From Swiss-Prot:
Alphabetical UniProt keywords: ATP-binding, Helicase, Hydrolase, Nucleotide-binding, RNA-binding
All residue ranges annotated as the Helicase C-terminal domain in the record: 370-520
Residues engaged in binding ATP: A170, K171, T172, G173, T174, G175, K176, T177
Helicase ATP-binding domain span: 157-340
The keyword Membrane is assigned to this record: no
KW RNA-binding (keyword) present: yes
EC number annotated for this UniProt entry: 3.6.4.13
Signal peptide, first to last residue: none
Protein source organism: Oryza sativa subsp. japonica (Rice)
Region named Disordered: 56-80, 92-121
Domain notes: The Q motif is unique to and characteristic of the DEAD box family of RNA helicases and controls ATP binding and hydrolysis.
UniProt protein name: DEAD-box ATP-dependent RNA helicase 25
Record field: catalytic activity: ATP + H2O = ADP + phosphate + H(+)
InterPro entries: DEAD/DEAH_box_helicase_dom (IPR011545), Helicase_ATP-bd (IPR014001), Helicase_C-like (IPR001650), P-loop_NTPase (IPR027417), RNA-helicase_DEAD-box_CS (IPR000629), RNA_helicase_DEAD_Q_motif (IPR014014)
């Protein structure tokens, strides 16, 4: 027995060796087992409790750190969750179990679909067996159900395999994840075994993603491609999780491939012993959805990470758009002779042709009733309905989900205030199911594939044109038809000028009868006051940051009062003075403070 092992017995006396890893419990049962011995399921709770106490008291020591502004911001935006570890190490690729309260188990074989979320219109005529990849990778690719390469993969894979730095302009849903993972895995598999088999190997492939959902999705894809690369492993470190849990997981299950969100990656560089040393082995650095990484304010973190990895490396940037800021970071991160590969055809970066786009302009106090009416009709017309409703903020998302749940619609919600385990569970359920309505903030706008979405509704003005397009892109995928509806208040109509070149037309606002309005208002009244207070504060913050609407503060206050009235409140909620100061709204007449 090794340190940390426990010798347990079932009720019939069968000896079981339990090895406690920081994030899991492995049970080893002797090969010779008495006939009729009882299963271990009844003893699982006691075993988990015993090992949990041991791990908590004897886990690896990690340094305490000061709570940074980044922590506070991530908790505010991302919520709290637990870490997730995906491993593909050793014989028989497996996934480590997770303790109670952590993110639920997910399996590469069960996540997504066989086509990897790729629209068939993006497939090329080139097969994977026609390119120079190893037999192990080719076998994994075939097992994953991939036969033909997408146009993005066809254009980028040969160049990346030559070892060149690449800036690729590529839309989500076009196979870009495999486009950077497959050649990177080829680089890693060619490294000397001594570099890959050591107890704590260097991190050789580092992938940075803007969101937790995308990071998990990339790791799942990597796990598929690593199926026959027995000595390579992948892990995920993501914002909003327990740093100490991730530190212990990386000690117990060292990996060569790390997928991370930038803020959490920076945390590990600053607070995890030996982590910076492991980054010195990075051979390939990937920035996935580089434009969104920069839009979310991660530039400083990215620059620090770039400074932490070797200069002699291969760098890959994949981005749906290539604005000036992406070009600036490419000059910092990449060699001067990098290749720019544009896989987006003129006009193709816009919405899918199969999506019917409509907008409605209606007073704010009718939005909930109109939303309910539209959903009822869509559910009645399509038995296989699958709807995503995008809201402006996480707390407004929560409010809308609670109202629609009161109206007895089949609702799921996903946003940054949900724990990672809850988000993963909802995301997996929505991906695999039909007959569901997902109310979401922008965590689902890009990089996450949900097949067969029949309708996308955007409630409130999007932040910009690109956000509108990316949200709409959740439907009309793989050549299938879809519908999009943008629901705006009269004072949000200005946004239409930014999408006037798209095929969008005005829809007639439904005349919601008085009985339906009464039902909806009753549902709104049943929502807890705390949810309304949080939604009001978040709504005010969102529109205050809008350059058009937030410019005139007195008008903004009146609009916020309209939103408050739509929640069936006679008086707008009070907001803490500290929050108002941060918004620049302290001493603005009409706002109540605490």
């Amino acid at each position: 027995m090794a340190a940390g092992d426990l010798l347990l017995r079932t009720q019939s006396g069968l000896p079981v060796l339990a090895r406690a890893f920081p994030s899991c419990l492995c049970l080893r049962v002797p090969a010779r087992r008495r006939r009729g011995a009882p299963p271990l399921t009844a003893a699982k709770v006691d075993v988990a409790d015993a090992v949990g106490r041991r791990v908590r008291s004897g886990g690896a020591a990690v340094p305490k750190r000061r709570r940074s502004r980044r922590d506070a911001e991530e908790e505010e935006e991302e919520g709290l969750a637990f870490s997730r570890v995906v491993t593909g190490r050793g014989r028989g690729v497996r996934e480590e179990g997770v303790a109670e309260g952590e993110a639920p188990e997910f399996d590469a074989a069960k996540s997504g679909d066989e086509s990897g979320g790729v629209d068939g219109s993006y497939l090329s005529d080139t097969r994977f067996d026609q390119c120079t990849i190893s037999p192990l990778s080719l076998k994994a690719v075939k097992d994953a159900g991939y036969e033909r390469m997408t146009q993005v993969q066809e254009a980028t894979l040969p160049v990346i395999l030559q070892g060149k730095d690449v800036l690729a302009k590529a839309k989500t849903g076009t196979g870009k994840t495999v486009a950077f993972l497959l050649p990177a895995i080829e680089v890693l598999s060619a490294l000397p075994n001594s570099r890959r088999d050591q107890l704590r190997p260097s991190i050789n492939l580092l992938v940075m993603c803007p969101t937790r959902e995308l990071a998990i999705q990339v790791a799942v894809e990597a796990k598929k491609l690593l199926k026959y690369h027995r000595s390579l492993g992948v892990q995920v470190v993501i914002g909003g999780t327990r740093l100490t849990q991730e530190q212990r997981s990386m000690q117990a299950n060292p990996c060569q491939i790390l997928v991370a969100t930038p803020g959490r990656l920076k945390d590990h560089v600053e607070n995890t012993p030996g982590f910076s040393t492991r980054l010195k082995g990075v051979k390939v650095l990937v920035l996935d959805e580089a434009d969104r990484l920069l839009d979310m304010g991660f530039r400083r973190d990215i620059e620090r990470i770039i400074a932490s990895v070797p200069k002699e490396r291969q760098t890959l940037l994949f981005s749906a758009t290539v604005p000036e800021e992406v070009r600036q970071i490419s000059h910092i991160a990449m060699k001067k002779n990098y290749k720019f590969i544009n896989t987006v055809k003129d006009g193709d970066e816009e919405t899918h042709a199969q999506v019917s786009q409509m907008f409605m302009i209606a007073p704010l106090d009718l939005h909930f009733s109109i939303l309910y009416d539209v959903l009822k009709k869509h559910v009645a017309e399509d038995a296989d309905y699958k709807v995503i409703i995008f809201c402006t903020t996480a707390m407004v998302t929560k409010l809308v989900a609670e109202i629609l749940s009161q109206l007895r619609l089949n609702i799921r919600e996903i946003h940054s205030r949900k724990s990672q385990s809850a988000r993963t569970k909802v995301s997996d359920e929505f991906r695999k199911s039909r007959g569901l309505i997902l109310v979401s903030s922008d965590v689902s706008a890009r990089g996450v594939d949900y097949p067969d979405v029949t309708l996308v509704i955007q409630v409130g003005v999007p932040a910009d044109r690109q956000q509108y397009i990316h949200r709409l892109g959740r439907t009309g995928r793989k050549g299938k038809e879809g519908q999009g509806l943008l629901l705006l208040a009269p004072w949000e109509k200005y946004f239409l000028s930014s999408i006037k070149d798209l095929s969008i037309s005005e829809a007639t606002v439904p005349s919601v009868d008085s009985s339906t309005q009464t039902i909806v208002k009753d549902a709104v009244r049943k929502v807890e006051m705390r949810s309304k207070e949080c939604a009001y504060q978040a709504w005010l913050g969102y529109y205050n940051s809008n350059k058009t609407i937030g410019r005139e503060k007195s008008r903004l206050v009146k609009l916020a009062e309209e939103f408050s009235q739509s929640m069936e409140l006679s008086v707008p909620p009070a907001i803490p003075k500290q929050i108002l100061r941060k918004m620049g709204l302290n001493n603005v007449p009409g706002l109540r403070s605490t």
